């Protein structure tokens, strides 16, 4: 959901390719999982270190700022996997244990992104 919103908010331009969007989406999902206290800091650091060791040197702040927030949230809310007014996300409880959650409002995600997009 995060990756799709990133791609869509840039109109699927060559500025951000699909693989980069997926990596950014994974990093965002990890950070959101950590912010919800679903994921332990130790697991977060292990995964993030592994991703960073791929030498992709990609950061969400390279492509997005708080100015992009409403557009990102618009595309997240439009995702076909959502139910009712809640945004459906795949988050991580621990390494190897993803969890599908359908309980996040645009307001909750906006609060997260206000800190995340610094």
Features from the language model and the residues they span:
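Active-site segments that bind and position negatively charged phosphate/pyrophosphate groups
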Residues: 1-67
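C-terminal charged capping/lid subdomain of soluble metabolic enzymes
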Residues: 38-118
């Amino acid at each position: 959901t995060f990756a799709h919103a990133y791609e869509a908010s840039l109109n699927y331009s060559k500025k951000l390719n699909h693989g980069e969007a997926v990596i950014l989406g994974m990093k965002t999902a990890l950070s959101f999982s950590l912010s919800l206290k679903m994921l332990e800091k130790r697991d977060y650091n292990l995964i993030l270190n592994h991703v960073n060791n791929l030498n992709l040197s990609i950061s969400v702040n390279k492509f997005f700022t708080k100015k992009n927030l409403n557009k990102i949230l618009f595309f997240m809310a439009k995702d076909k996997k959502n139910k009712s007014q809640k945004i459906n996300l795949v988050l991580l409880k621990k390494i190897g244990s993803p969890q599908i959650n359908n309980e996040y409002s645009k307001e909750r995600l906006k609060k997260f992104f206000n800190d995340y997009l610094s």
